[in-house]
Amino acid sequence: MTALYWEDIQIGTRRDLGGYTFSEAEIIRFAKKYDPQVFHVDPEAAKQSIFGGLIASGWHTAAVWMKLSLAEREASKGTTPLMRAGVSPGFEDMRWIKPVRPGMTLRFSSEVCGKQELRSRPELGL
């Protein structure tokens, strides 16, 4: 696998991670385990919620992004130079703009929006 070095990383570089369709059963299964709010777990009760129906947990959509990101990275090994992956420093601005309903397909991507050197770990950057 060819490594991608700090100076090679270009702001604006975008990677398509593919699409994912959220099924009702999967939305309910995820939410029952991790985010059991009524509008995620009960289609009938969800009709009375502010969303007017069942929606996926935002954490479900984030988990799907992570799954697709790792799958795309694995599929790219040996064919595309990759950035070294490490522990995430967290998120500053994660928002869920629109509800994700059963049957919806979302397309996911990642984009390099900036770069930051780490003084404490000169071999790494964000």
Question: What are the roles of these predicted feature ranges?
Answer:
Residues 1-89:
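Hot-dog-fold acyl-thioester-processing enzymes
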Residues 87, 91-126:
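Hydrophobic beta-sheet segments that form the core/acyl-binding groove
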